[in-house]
């Protein structure tokens, strides 16, 4: 009897788990529980309730639009509309506080404009909905909100069909006919997730292994598609491929094999869960023989659903180097764990990013309103990888390491002049409060509700001084400099990469120089701000200066590197 082949190659091993591997698997699951990665049954039931409510709202939304477009009651009721999930929730690897990636699928007579003009107000009217922020001009437009305290990211797709019944499934490629590209991308979130689950030998093994790998990647700060690291779908496909190669293994073995196999992988050979398939659309499918840009992908991980795309096109030379270094480190730890020389907790130690380098670039996006900052900070963050690739071309820089998330602040300034200085990168003793994107969403709502009446120059009616807020998001890039024995770095000129980055950001068609700015500074590790460290974490200490004149000159040149806010 032949064993079923999972994936495009035969398995490496079909051996069942040993007693020790089973014991290590139990220990792994216990460690994941200790790390609070599993949600309580009550919270999971609450998510189901929220999705049921969203389905009802979607049905009402489609009916409302249908009636407005002169359909009769029967046709409007039959038009349907359906909610799908994708990402970690659909994969079954969500945890406490995770958002739900959600897709609303509608028939052809319901437009994207209706999504924002009709569905968004319907959501705002619900008392269960808070922190709602719409981003209609994103490439994949989205509405973010909380429903009964659960974060929802809601995207939109319109099919070229007159009705979307509740029993509709998205697996049929023909459903993509006549659908615009942005909707294909949205639909493929669900389609890819479903295919990943269909292409693994054992879903329970896959899910536990994926929870472990995702948590490891987050702890090591290498989980963020936007800045050049794999995102959730890419990590899921990598884990799925290892499951295919070891179809009878338990999760502990999958995790241990994961690091060694992927570090030794013959990149840029792609990771595929199944052969790339053709389909009914005249659309681009990943093909490095046909497209030079596809050939340039360093660690291609290809989505299984038609049309196949590369989920890791953002990876740069630097981020690839960092990923592979982390896999070597993790592989060595996993080897020790598998012989019971170390506990699983050793694998999940926090990153040392803010201790690893001597010099960092701080990239700060600033705006004078919360609404502007939500969009502007997202735009600047999306361009960071382009700054990384330009820094990689500087002779003196061996590696440019972007941190995987930004840090948000609100500076409360006492005058317009002070606010302008803060937004331009001038360091002032200004009161600030920590914030996050949820607070920005709240502030955006508050701004919309605020009176448009002109404030008095000396402040509000109750005598309080007027506050001029400046919202900032700061991202970090660690610089690893070239180490050439006997040839110390005499000058580090990053004016060209930074100027190109400024120009790239400010080409955005929504850029407003009266509201927004971006600036870059060089910061030594000893001068990093408190918010990048956890409470009680030891900060980097200044090292004793070496006596060589060249080394001193090199440090001074970097210190003096002036990066304008052009």
Curated annotation (Swiss-Prot):
Pfam families the UniProt entry points to: PAP_central, PAP_NTPase, PAP_RNA-bind
Record's subcellular location: Nucleus
Enzyme class (EC, first level): transferase
InterPro entries xref list: NT_sf (IPR043519), NuclTrfase_I-like_C (IPR011068), PolA_pol_cen_dom (IPR007012), PolA_pol_NTPase (IPR048840), PolA_pol_RNA-bd_dom (IPR007010), PolyA_polymerase (IPR014492)
Binding sites annotated in the UniProt record for Mg(2+) 2: 99, 101, 153
Entry binding sites for ATP: 86-88, 99-101, 153, 214, 223, 232-233
Binding site for Mg(2+) 1: 99, 101
Region annotation Disordered: where it falls in the sequence: 437-463, 530-566
Record GO terms (molecular function): ATP binding; metal ion binding; poly(A) RNA polymerase activity; RNA binding
Name this protein carries in UniProt: Poly(A) polymerase pla1
Species annotation: Schizosaccharomyces pombe (strain 972 / ATCC 24843)
């Amino acid at each position: 009897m032949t064993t079923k082949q999972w994936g495009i190659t035969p398995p490496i091993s079909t051996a069942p788990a040993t007693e020790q591997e089973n014991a290590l698997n139990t220990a792994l699951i216990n460690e994941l529980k200790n790390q609070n990665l599993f949600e309580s049954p009550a919270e999971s039931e609450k998510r189901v309730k929220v999705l049921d409510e969203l389905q009802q709202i979607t049905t009402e939304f489609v009916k409302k639009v249908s009636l407005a477009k002169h359909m009769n009651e029967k046709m409007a009721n039959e038009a349907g509309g359906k909610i799908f999930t994708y990402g970690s929730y659909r994969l079954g690897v969500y945890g406490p506080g995770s958002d739900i990636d959600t897709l609303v699928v509608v028939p052809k007579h319901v437009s994207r404009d209706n999504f924002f003009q009709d569905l968004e107000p319907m959501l705002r009217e619900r008392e269960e909905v808070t922190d709602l922020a719409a981003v209609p001009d994103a490439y994949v437009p989205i509405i973010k909100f909380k429903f009964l305290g659960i974060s929802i990211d809601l995207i939109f797709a319109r099919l070229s069909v007159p009705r979307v019944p509740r029993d509709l499934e998205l697996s049929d490629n023909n459903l993509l006919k006549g659908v615009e590209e942005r909707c294909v991308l949205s639909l493929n979130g669900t389609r890819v997730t479903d295919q990943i689950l269909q292409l693994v030998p054992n879903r329970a093994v896959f899910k536990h292994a994926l929870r472990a790998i995702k948590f490891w990647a987050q702890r090591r700060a290498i989980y963020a598609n936007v800045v050049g690291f794999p995102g959730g779908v890419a990590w899921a496909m990598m884990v799925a491929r290892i499951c295919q190669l070891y179809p009878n293994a338990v999760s502990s073995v999958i995790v241990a094999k994961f690091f060694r196999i992927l570090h030794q992988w013959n990149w840029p050979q792609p990771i595929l869960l199944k052969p790339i398939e053709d389909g009914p659309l005249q659309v681009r499918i990943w093909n490095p023989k046909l497209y030079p840009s596809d050939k340039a992908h360093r660690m291609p991980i290809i989505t299984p659903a038609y049309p196949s795309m590369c989920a890791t096109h953002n990876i740069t030379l630097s981020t690839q180097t960092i990923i592979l270094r982390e896999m070597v480190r993790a592989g060595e730890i996993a080897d020790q764990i598998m012989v019971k020389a170390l506990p699983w907790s050793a694998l999940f130690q926090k990153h040392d990013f803010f201790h690893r380098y001597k010099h960092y670039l701080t990239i700060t996006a600033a705006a004078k309103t919360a609404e502007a900052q939500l969009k502007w900070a997202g735009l600047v963050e999306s361009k960071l990888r382009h700054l990384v690739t330009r820094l990689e071309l500087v002779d003196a820089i061996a590696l440019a390491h972007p941190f995987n998330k930004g840090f948000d602040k609100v500076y409360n300034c006492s005058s317009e002049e002070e606010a302008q200085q803060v937004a331009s990168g001038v360091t002032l003793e200004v009161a600030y409060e920590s914030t996050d994107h949820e607070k920005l969403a709240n502030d955006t709502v508050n701004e919309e509700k605020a009176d448009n009446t002109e404030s008095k120059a000396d402040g509000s009616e109750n005598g309080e001084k007027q506050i001029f807020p400046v919202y900032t998001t700061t991202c970090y890039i660690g610089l690893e400099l070239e180490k050439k024995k006997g040839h110390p770095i005499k000058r580090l000129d990053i004016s060209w990469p930074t100027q190109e980055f400024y120009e790239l950001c400010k080409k955005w068609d929504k850029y407003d120089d009266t509201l927004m700015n971006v600036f870059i500074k060089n910061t030594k590790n000893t001068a990093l701000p408190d918010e990048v460290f956890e409470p009680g974490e030891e900060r980097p200490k200044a090292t004793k200066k070496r006596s060589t004149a060249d080394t001193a000159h090199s440090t001074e040149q970097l210190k003096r590197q002036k990066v304008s806010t052009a």
